Amino acid sequence: MARIAGVNIPENKHTVISLTYIFGIGRTRAESICATTGIEQTAKVRELTGEQLDAIRGEVAKFSTEGDLRREINMNIKRLMDLGCYRGIRHRRGLPLRGQRTKTNARTRKGPRKPIRK
């Protein structure tokens, strides 16, 4: 298994698909990484040479991925909550942020139904 950005990526898949196993790299970014490194997208990871893997590692290192990206996202949410702005309050209460209705629906964000106590 090839290891890129602290993630074991599958060797029997195409390079583009394997790169999407890294948090913060989607299909578009994976395609651009393959284009800049000159690696064919349909090439399997096990067929790549060590130099090509190093080139991919160098390109991936330019982006914020995995733990750094998760930390950055959590810090942004924490900042919103500390500011006390509308989005921060909605995060704190566990409600939808972007104007969705909550009288009905929004079960995913609100969690399972609470029983009514009499």
Curated annotation (Swiss-Prot):
What biological process terms from GO does the record include? translation
Entry's InterPro entries? Rbsml_uS13_C (IPR027437), Ribosomal_uS13 (IPR001892), Ribosomal_uS13-like_H2TH (IPR010979), Ribosomal_uS13_bac-type (IPR019980), Ribosomal_uS13_CS (IPR018269)
Ranges where the record places region Disordered: 94-118
Which of UniProt's keywords are assigned here? Answer: Ribonucleoprotein, Ribosomal protein, RNA-binding, rRNA-binding, tRNA-binding
> Which GO terms of the molecular function aspect are on file?
rRNA binding; structural constituent of ribosome; tRNA binding
Disulphide bridges, residue numbers: none
Q: Which GO terms describe its cellular component?
A: cytosol; small ribosomal subunit
Query: So which residues are the signal peptide here?
Result: none
Q: So which domain of life are we looking at?
A: Bacteria
Which HAMAP family does this UniProt record tie to the protein?
Ribosomal_uS13 (MF_01315)
NCBIfam families named in the record: uS13_bact (TIGR03631)
| Protein family per UniProt | Belongs to the universal ribosomal protein uS13 family.
Subunit composition? Part of the 30S ribosomal subunit. Forms a loose heterodimer with protein S19. Forms two bridges to the 50S subunit in the 70S ribosome.
Instruction: Name the job this protein performs.
Output: Located at the top of the head of the 30S subunit, it contacts several helices of the 16S rRNA. In the 70S ribosome it contacts the 23S rRNA (bridge B1a) and protein L5 of the 50S subunit (bridge B1b), connecting the 2 subunits; these bridges are implicated in subunit movement. Contacts the tRNAs in the A and P-sites.
Query: What is the name listed in the Swiss-Prot or TrEMBL entry for this protein?
Result: Small ribosomal subunit protein uS13
Give the organism, scientific name.
Alcanivorax borkumensis (strain ATCC 700651 / DSM 11573 / NCIMB 13689 / SK2)
